[in-house]
Amino acid sequence: MKTKQKKMIKKLLAGVMAAAMLVAGLPVLQVSAQTVSPAKPIVIVLDPGHGGYDGGAMHKWNGKTYREKDVNLAIAKACKKKLETYMGVKVYMTRSSDYFVSLNGRVAYAKKNGADLFVALHNNASTRTNVKGACVYYPNAHYNARIGAKGKAVAQSIQNRLVALGLKNNGVLIRNSESKTKYPDKSLADYYNVIKNSKTSGFAGLIV
């Protein structure tokens, strides 16, 4: 097998090993969940980005076309399988095959299932070959500082694990609304719909 192919496969495996990244965040969630009820399972909702007619980013390599929607789903399934080996953890997925779900529908599904954490999984593309690595977006501190703090802690834990797998560290980030969208308390909202709606629904939302 060529060296380039080996490197690519290693990176793909690192992506699938994102299953381990969520495990890294479990202690943070357990502290919060056990404050309410030690018997209550931790509910994690995985959101494989895109789906159906929305293919997301696309990359051609070695004669094959890879679509983001498919890679996101594969990673989510690997994460779910790994997470379900832990006692006291319940995992849901916003989609289990190739179909489209609206952004609002994804968070509504998480809320319906009593989510403690919502994790959207994405793989970006760039025309610049030097752009690579991983980052995690988490909620800002506005409107509900507790959710913001929890989200930041889990985001950092996930990012640490991804960096340990060999991915370039692009940091843990927040992105505020650029259109002056506000939370109910008139504070500046988060930019990303799934993070904003997760916060107003009572749980932290991340984008990995």
What would you call each of these model-derived segments?
Residues 41-65:
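Short glycine-rich His-centered loop
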Residues 38-41, 66, 70-208:
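Active-site-proximal helix/loop segments of hydrolytic enzymes
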Residues 7-25:
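Sec-dependent N-terminal signal peptides
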Residues 4, 21, 184-187:
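Short, functionally important structural connectors and interaction interfaces within domains
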Residues 1-12, 34-35:
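Short, Lys/Arg-enriched, disordered terminal segments
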Residues 22-23, 59, 134:
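Hydrophobic alpha-helical membrane context
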Residues 22-39:
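Sec-dependent signal peptide cleavage junction
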